[in-house]
Every structure is written in C-alpha cells, then in structure tokens.
C-alpha cells in the first residue's frame, strides 16, 4: 500500500508514485549560515495562511542575505505571490521585482539568494518552482521547512540544484546542504521570548509570560483589596458608616507589616535610581528646549531675510 502525504495545499499526494528528485552521492559546493529570523518568518507566514484558509497551506517566499565566495549567509526573507495553474505553482515575477526594489532600499548590502517553501520531502513540484527561480538568479538556494513534523530536531533542510544524467537526459536534481545557525546580538534578544516556550505542548505562553501574568493577577487583587480598605476608612471618617475597631486594628497592623528599608545600601541604590530618572527627564527637557530654540531661530532668520529684502527694495526708490 503506497504511503500518502499532504503537499501543503490540502491535497493528498502518493509519495511512492512520485519520482525522486534527490541527487545521490553529491557533496555541497557552498557553506550556509542560517539566521533564526528566517525560520521565524517562514513559520509566521505558514501560521497566518493556515489561520486564514482554515487548513494547512503551502507558502512560498524569497531568501535574502550575503554571499562571499562559497560562504552564504541567509539573513532575512519576504513573502512571494504565487498561483496554481493546472496543479502547477507559478510565481508572480512582477511582484518579486517590486519587492526586490523595496528591500534593496532598506537592505542595501543584501542580495537575493533563493527561495523557501513548506512541506515534506522535495518533489517534482519543487523542481518546477526552482526552475522559475533559476530564471531570476543563477544557482539559487532552496530551503524547505516541515511545520507538521513531530521530531525534536529542527525541521529545516537546505538544498542546491545540480544537473545529472537520468535515463540519458539532463535532469535537474537537488543536493542537500549542511548548514549552521548564526545569530547576532539584536537577533538573540528578539528571539529570546520564543526560545523560552514551555514544554506543555500548548505553545501559547512562555515561562516569562506566565510568570508576569501571575504577578499581574496578584498585584491586581492586592490593589482592589487596598482600595476597598481605603474606601472604608474614608467612609468611617466621614460618618457614612460606623467605626469597626476590629477592622481598623487589622488595617493598622497591615500597614505596620509593610517592610521599611532604611539601610545604607537601599538609600544609595534609591538615590542612584532617582538621579537616573531625574537625568533622563532633564535630558528630555533639554532636547525639547533645543527643538523649540531651533524653530525660533529658523523663524527669526526667515523674518530677518524678509525685512532685509524690504529695506533693499525701499532703497531702490530713494
């Protein structure tokens, strides 16, 4: 019985019936460094499409980065438009060229390196799309992410195309490349929240988010209780409700239970923090004052130039 798998468009594909597109015994010609931001972008793209369509969908996008000789660094990505004609995917090249102009304005030192998609093992439909990308760039990379896998390993594979003789004909095949993960300082900070996902299987909240939610709930409850006590004390002082000495004693005991720090270290840290906050406020005020002064000088220069022109014009008649 032949195995069946989804091709990412909601259709079942007979895997055994598809011809193999993988090259055997071929060593990669380049080294690839992959940034986590690319994986996050692809995952976000796939999740959004699944939410919009209500079922898993295959997504396609472009890879950008830097290349120096045989070393390729995939640093970012963006989405591509595509359509299905006769069960074959066709890339919207006009959309790509528009996006290319836009990303070159922002990322001037990056170039188009290849494309990505989602799904399982590469099949002939991937070769069909890869040939279209080859019309844009020579020897593009091909990255495929499998979002449905249950393995703990990173479900990402990177390929390059090779030409081999199959049944006497030149055929484009894919050779898998090994890759390493490369991160920058800003990127590590950005993905730290995602990296701290809990192992409960829900994947909805991270450990940091759960801790902050618990703290927020506790502080919210404390605030409501303190506000209730304060309202009672004010009402008792105003004669709206009778004095309950037991409640007042408990409120007084609660106030005396609050920690009072008077150590030298606390005073030093407190004054340092106050100085930092005051300095930030002072710098903000100075910046605002400089901006106001700059606007005043500009308006003064405009007015002075106009008066100078008026005096010169009057001098022509006397």
UniProtKB/Swiss-Prot annotation:
Superkingdom classification of source: Eukaryota
Residue ranges the record marks as coiled coil: none
Any one GO BP annotation for this protein: protein deneddylation
GO cellular component, one term: cytoplasm
Keywords: Cytoplasm, Nucleus, Signalosome
CDD domains: MPN_CSN6
Keyword Cytoplasm: yes
Residue ranges constituting the MPN domain according to the UniProt record: 32-165
Locations listed in the record: Cytoplasm; Nucleus
Similarity-based family: Belongs to the peptidase M67A family. CSN6 subfamily.
InterPro entries in alphabetical order: EIF3F/CSN6-like_C (IPR024969), JAMM/MPN+_dom (IPR000555), MPN (IPR037518), MPN_CSN6 (IPR033859)
Protein name (record): COP9 signalosome complex subunit 6
Gene3D superfamilies: Cytidine Deaminase, domain 2 (3.40.140.10)
Function, as annotated: Component of the COP9 signalosome complex (CSN), a complex involved in various cellular and developmental processes. The CSN complex is an essential regulator of the ubiquitin (Ubl) conjugation pathway by mediating the deneddylation of the cullin subunits of E3 ligase complexes, leading to modify the Ubl ligase activity.
GO terms assigned for molecular function: metallopeptidase activity
Assembly and binders: Component of the CSN complex, probably composed of cops1, cops2, cops3, cops4, cops5, cops6, cops7, cops8 and cops9.
PANTHER family, sorted: COP9 SIGNALOSOME COMPLEX SUBUNIT 6 (PTHR10540:SF8), EUKARYOTIC TRANSLATION INITIATION FACTOR 3 SUBUNIT F-RELATED (PTHR10540)
